[in-house]
């Protein structure tokens, strides 16, 4: 064997005789290939043949330099060698060696590495002759083994096994090599594989070798496998497709790596088939090993693999044995196994779907959603979210994001376009149309969105002319009056013009020229070009052409009649002149005649007229006759068209008529165009002031808001309802976040109550304002509820109030409105439920007391249940014992009984005054009430006297408390720091619960608080001044103010009026 680290360059000069001079028969080479090998060795070698197909033999790259060397050295050889060399090169297959320094295991030749030697002289060639026999033998073996033995490539996995096989082959061939060397015709030198290291093999030409063509050689024998049944390709099991996960990426065949197909035509077909089977089995096992080990083992066992070690004998294939075993099993077990397999597959599919959902969930989606959920008005956060989902492949996440965003900002027409384009990319046309319809309903004045939608319609329904035209008509009806709708009109005209439907184009221009738009001049110029460049019969309607034609002939007839009458007048005047001239001529003629007579008489000339006279008379006659003929011809021509021309026959139009019809058609539109120009001029300044006609969350400038208000006032003053509504819609797109413009539109629509369809318009405006753009404005919701209640839609009104109550809780005005709506519709049980709900849910004692008072009145006056009203007030008083208003309301309800219960009223007063924390002023107040009540309704004088004593004691204590408060340093500092007098506790507490709790309980109906916001300083019942809190001096004669109490400064005197003063609360 050759030493390691050397390269081998072996030449296989075709299949030839093994002797050096005489050609052996082709059959002599057959035993040296495979017939001497055992069946076991054949099986192993067949496996190696399959591996040999994967080796890349770079024949072309190595063949060129050696061919060049042979060609350069050929002139130095003898002629017999030149002829032999050229014949050999046609059959030689060059086996390239690996690069220098490659290990023996990576060599491409099975007999080890041999150094590459070059011969430069003829002596080297002579030395080569002595080694011709051995070279021929080795080259033949190399050529044979190229088809029967695997070549060792750089990527083989079992190099050691292959090396041992190759060494075994060489050792088995040593006897033959010795016999060949001992023969007479062989060379004297021993040629073995080791000696080739010193030999020159660059020009390995063998002189005595007979060249045999490949057709004369026997076919390569196929490796035989003992006890193997021959089967066709159809009988072999097909490679089963691996079960890939659902999220596996689909790639095309172009993206797959190129396969190395270096197999020659002489390679056997059977190893290829087995290799394909083995590769399919290996790929299936590799892909399914992680998730389906059990199923993979079953599938791989069914494939036939001759090289795999099995415990079964070679008498039968494993697949056949398995079939026999399966046939022996009962059919029921087979069915059960199949069912179990199906169930397992279903479970695996379900698990894979769940895993796929979890896996497909976008990683950063929650981060973007968190930003907009925390602040739904964060427009920038919404844009980031939509940009993120638009770039991902999760359709459900994208739909959810777009739907939520557009529910908050439906006037962003650009995102409707993006949403529709996203659905179009997904290939779902139905969803794309739904998105377009939703967008056009939300923002019908978006010209760009309409154009985008119409392009989509034309691309999908281009053949349906009727449908496309209906969509264009729908578009111009929705936003055709918009001042900047020129692009839409131009697109409509262009579409009709492409199909050469010029009469429809003229009809569109008739509508467009009457609308003030930004490109009004261009539209009229285009219309003129259309009329002048095409025949009037295809541009104008037949009725219009016939009418204009009749007008033309009528004008011509009137012109002819006028010209004939003028001609008559001219002819009459000219006839008079002619008569005078004729008279003069006659006189001249008479004179001439006399002279002629005299001459004839004198001369004796002939008788008759001269030629001049005859000519003159003929000229006069001819003049008269021509005048008559012209008059008759003109009158005939004028009467002929009216009598004989068929105006409906447009084929008889002449050039003069066509010119007249065009001029008249254009002039008629020019009048409309002039009116449009004036309308555009009046609106141009307002249109120039609109700097942002689209929607955005950023606030508008004051100049922009003022311009919109002035523009709306201008259109309202003009009185065109359709144009006013279009302008309002344009304004609301740019000013959607300003509720004043919504209110302005509602007030305008309320002025149109007598007109039809106004109710639906008002309801739609309320819906958009309250549900979309201003969902947290109570004022708009209260107005909407009142509108629906006026339309007798109590259910809708209650729903509106319930929604705003949930969004803006703890608003007393909303609570009262909800209760009263239910009361007006007669749902008294619902009223009780709402009263109890609000009383129990409120945390403010003052608000709870106010609600309890109203609830008691409701029970007394509406439900006629006074005892239930007293019970409600009693519960409220127990919750807030210091609430003066609740106690006074209880006294009032007791007084409204048919028979006043003295004991009941006195108990209420005594219980309230018996509190330990009662203020002196409040105690004085209730003592006064008790005295007044007993004076009017008391049954005994003793009770009245006791009440008077209690009042005097209360006044004394109140006076002492007043002096202490006035004499305290803090009191002096506070009084000196303030400009005006400080009201006492009695004044501040008059009918106001004596504290700040009630001050928070109020709500304000005034216009100063447009959203009925509940402020801490807004009192439910505004605190009264001392003059308002004091009673009138009805009982001044009682003298309760004496003793200096009434003389106190600051208006803190107790001038008590009649007890019924708290009736002012009703």
Swiss-Prot record:
Biased segments, Acidic residues type: 48-64, 226-236, 245-256
Q: Where is the composition biased (Polar residues)?
A: 171-190, 200-211, 303-317
Predominant location category: nucleus
Q: Where is the composition biased (Basic and acidic residues)?
A: 274-301, 318-358, 575-602, 957-966
Q: Which SMART domains match?
A: HAT (SM00386)
List keywords of the entry alphabetically: mRNA processing, mRNA splicing, Nucleus, Phosphoprotein, Repeat
Spans of the HAT repeats are 393-425, 427-459, 463-498, 685-717, 719-751, 757-793, 1029-1066
What is its subcellular localisation?
Nucleus
Which residues are annotated as modified residue Phosphoserine in the UniProt record?
122, 148, 158, 252, 308, 313
GO CC, any one term: U2-type prespliceosome
- Biological processes per GO annotation: mRNA 5'-splice site recognition; mRNA splicing, via spliceosome; regulation of alternative mRNA splicing, via spliceosome
- Locations of Low complexity compositional bias? 967-978
Please give the superkingdom of this protein's source.
Eukaryota
UniProt cross-references to PANTHER family, sorted A to Z: PRE-MRNA PROCESSING PROTEIN PRP39-RELATED, PRE-MRNA-PROCESSING FACTOR 39
Give the family per the record: Belongs to the PRP39 family.
Q: Briefly, what is this protein's role?
A: Involved in pre-mRNA splicing.
Q: What is this protein called?
A: Pre-mRNA-processing factor 39
Q: Which organism is it from?
A: Drosophila melanogaster (Fruit fly)
């Amino acid at each position: 064997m050759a030493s390691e680290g050397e390269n081998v360059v072996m030449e296989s000069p075709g299949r030839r005789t093994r002797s050096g001079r005489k050609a052996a028969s082709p059959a002599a080479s057959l035993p040296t290939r495979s017939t001497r090998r055992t069946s076991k060795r054949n099986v192993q070698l067949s496996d190696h043949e399959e591996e040999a197909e994967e080796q890349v033999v770079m024949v072309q790259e190595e063949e060129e330099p050696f061919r060049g060397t042979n060609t350069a050295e050929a002139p130095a050889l003898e002629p017999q060698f030149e002829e032999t060399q050229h014949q050999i090169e046609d059959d030689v297959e060059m086996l390239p060696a690996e690069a220098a320094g490659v290990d023996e295991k990576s060599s491409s030749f099975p007999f080890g590495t041999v150094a590459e030697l070059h011969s430069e002289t003829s002596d080297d060639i002579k030395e080569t002759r002595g080694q011709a026999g051995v070279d021929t033998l080795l080259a033949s073996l190399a050529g044979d083994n190229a088809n029967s033995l695997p070549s060792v490539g750089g990527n083989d996995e079992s190099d050691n096994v292959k090396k041992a096989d190759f060494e075994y082959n060489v050792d088995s061939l040593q006897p033959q090599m010795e016999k060949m060397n001992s023969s007479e015709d062989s060379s004297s030198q021993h040629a073995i594989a080791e000696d080739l290291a010193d030999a020159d093999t660059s020009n390995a030409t063998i002189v005595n070798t007979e060249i045999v063509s490949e057709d004369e050689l026997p076919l390569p024998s196929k490796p035989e496998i003992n006890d193997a049944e021959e089967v066709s390709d159809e009988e072999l099991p097909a490679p089963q497709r691996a079960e890939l996960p659902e999220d596996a990426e689909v790639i095309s065949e172009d993206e797959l790596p190129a396969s190395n197909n270096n197999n020659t035509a002489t390679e056997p077909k059977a190893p290829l088939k087995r290799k394909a089977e083995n590769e399919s089995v290996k790929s299936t096992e590799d892909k399914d090993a992680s998730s389906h080990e059990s199923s993979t083992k079953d599938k791989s066992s069914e494939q036939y693999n001759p090289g795999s070690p099995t415990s079964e004998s070679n008498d039968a294939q494993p697949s056949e044995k398995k079939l026999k075993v399966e046939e022996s099993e009962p059919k029921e077990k087979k069915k059960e196994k199949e069912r179990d397999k199906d169930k397992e597959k279903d479970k695996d599919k379900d698990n894979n779907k769940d895993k796929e959902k979890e896996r497909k969930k976008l990683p950063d989606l929650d981060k973007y959603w968190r930003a907009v959920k925390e602040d739904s008005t964060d427009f920038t956060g919404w844009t980031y979210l939509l940009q993120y989902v638009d770039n991902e492949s999760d359709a459900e996440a994208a739909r959810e994001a777009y739907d939520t965003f557009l529910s908050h900002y439906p006037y962003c027409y650009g995102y409707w376009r993006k949403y529709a384009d996203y659905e179009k990319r997904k290939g779902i046309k139905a969803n794309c149309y739904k998105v377009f319809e939703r967008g056009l309903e939300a923002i019908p004045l978006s010209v760009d969105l309409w154009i985008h939608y119409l392009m989509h319609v034309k691309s999908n329904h281009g053949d349906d002319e009727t449908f496309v035209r209906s969509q264009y008509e729908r578009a111009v009806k929705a936003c055709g009056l918009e001042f900047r709708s020129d692009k839409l009109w131009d697109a409509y005209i262009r579409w009709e013009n492409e199909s050469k439907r010029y009469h429809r184009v003229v009809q569109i221009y008739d509508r467009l020229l009457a609308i003030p738009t930004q490109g009004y001049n261009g539209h009229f110029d285009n219309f003129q070009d259309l009329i002048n460049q095409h025949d009037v019969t295809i541009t104008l309607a037949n009725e219009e052409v016939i009418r204009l034609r009749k007008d033309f002939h009528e004008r011509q007839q009137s012109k002819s009649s006028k010209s004939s009458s003028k001609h008559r007048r001219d002819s009459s005047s000219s006839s008079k002149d002619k008569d005078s001239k004729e008279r003069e001529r006659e006189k001249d003629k008479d004179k001439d005649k006399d002279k002629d007579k005299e001459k004839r008489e004198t001369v004796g000339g002939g008788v008759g007229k001269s030629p001049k006279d005859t000519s003159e008379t003929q000229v006069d006659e001819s003049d008269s006759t021509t005048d008559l003929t012209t008059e008759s011809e003109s009158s005939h021509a004028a009467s002929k068209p009216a009598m004989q021309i068929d105006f409906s026959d447009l084929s008889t139009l002449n050039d003069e008529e066509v010119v007249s019809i065009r001029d008249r058609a254009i002039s008629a539109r020019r009048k409309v165009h002039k009116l449009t120009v004036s309308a555009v001029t009046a609106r141009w300044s307002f249109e120039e002031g609109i700097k942002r006609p689209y929607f955005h969350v950023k606030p508008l400038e004051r100049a922009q808001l003022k311009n919109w208000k002035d523009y709306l006032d201008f259109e309202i003053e003009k009185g065109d309802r359709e144009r006013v509504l279009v302008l309002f819609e344009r304004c609301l797109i740019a000013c959607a976040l300003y509720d004043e413009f919504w209110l302005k539109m509602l007030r305008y629509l309320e002025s149109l109550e007598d007109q039809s369809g106004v109710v639906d318009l008002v309801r739609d405006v309320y819906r958009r304002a309250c549900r979309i753009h201003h969902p947290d404005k109570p004022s708009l919701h209260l107005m909407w509820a009142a509108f629906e209640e006026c339309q007798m839609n109590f259910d809708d009104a209650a729903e509106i109030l319930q929604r705003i109550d949930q969004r803006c809780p703890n608003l007393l005005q909303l609570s009262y409105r909800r209760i009263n709506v239910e009361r007006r519709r007669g749902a008294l049980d619902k009223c009780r439920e709402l009263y109890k709900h609000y009383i129990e849910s409120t945390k403010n004692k003052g608000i709870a007391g106010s609600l309890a008072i109203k609830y008691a009145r409701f029970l007394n006056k509406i439900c006629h249940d006074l005892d239930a009203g007293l019970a409600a007030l009693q519960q409220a008083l127990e919750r807030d014992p210091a609430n003066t208003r609740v106690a006074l309301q209880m006294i009032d309800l007791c007084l409204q009984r048919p028979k006043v219960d003295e004991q009941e009223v006195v108990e209420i007063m005594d219980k309230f005054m018996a509190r330990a924390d009662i203020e002196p002023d409040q105690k004085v107040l209730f003592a006064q009430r008790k005295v007044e009540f007993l004076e009017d309704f008391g049954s005994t004088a003793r009770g009245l006297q006791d009440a008077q004593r209690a009042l005097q004691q209360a006044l004394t204590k109140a006076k002492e408390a007043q002096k202490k408060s006035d004499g305290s340093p803090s009191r002096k500092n506070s009084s000196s720091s303030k400009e005006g007098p400080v009201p006492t506790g009695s004044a501040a507490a008059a009918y106001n619960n004596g504290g700040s709790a009630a001050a928070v309980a109020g709500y304000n109906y005034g216009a100063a608080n447009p959203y009925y916001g509940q402020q801490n300083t807004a009192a439910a019942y505004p605190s009264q001044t001392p003059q308002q809190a004091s009673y009138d001096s009805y009982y001044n004669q009682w003298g309760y103010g004496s003793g200096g109490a009434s003389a106190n400064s600051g208006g803190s005197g107790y001038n008590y009026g009649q007890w019924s003063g708290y009736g002012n609360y009703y």
